[in-house]
Amino acid sequence: NVSDGVTTVYLCGDSTVTDQSAEIPYLPGACYASWGQALPAFLDGRIAVENQAHCGLTTETFRQEGHMDIVKHFLRPGDFCLIQFGHNDQKLPHLLADREYPVNLRRYIEEVRNLGGIPVLVTSPGRNIWKEDGTYHELLAEHVQAVKDVAVSTNTPVIDLHEFSVRFYEKTGMERSCGYFHPGDYTHTNEYGACLFASCIAAGLGRIFPEVFHVTAGPSDFTPPENLWDLLDSQNNRAGGTEQKEQFDAMEKSTAALLKALEEADQASAEE
């Protein structure tokens, strides 16, 4: 239960948003962490964060597994609902940016508003993947644009985490940017990356809703050491499992597997 006078922010999303599990011994660079779990550090005590995001989910499976039902059950008028999907949707033909993906986003927005809540769309953070010529490899452009189009058509606020992340990678460079990700992973952040992205989300909320969100400084001087991956052993942190959501998360550790999955989804969609 949330006390009266406290606004709740509900988070709907995938592994880049979810509360990741802690590891012992704790090392900020070696553990998985997502911006959703770091967000409270940037907001004052009048805001509660309820993270319903889970690994491997899409705009479809988030609903199918009952997570949206939980949000709708507890959401009160004036509460906020941040919605970020895309990494896993783009691996399925029927959830591509010109198919059911925007339809699902609109449905979430409508449901939140019908309950008196305030929906906010968030574009997915970019992957730290680069082309052989040294330029950034943009893989989410279509889904990011779909989010922006839905935001315009439904008059919904949007926080462009994708733009923030890609600009950061290009400014910082691939090697240095790796320090913000779990070792061997180019999609899932560690504590450094979680705090970096949470700062963007908090700043966006403060800019759009200054009367509600008062952004704090968050962790100070929280940056990874150089060559972090060289300092850590990533071999014991490989994903496994056979469920779709586990397979999707495992793909993010292999650039080749990821690119193949995205290509197959595009081909399957074109053949339908």
Task: Describe the role of every protein-language-model region.
Residues 229-272:
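Acidic, Ser/Thr-rich low-complexity intrinsically disordered segments
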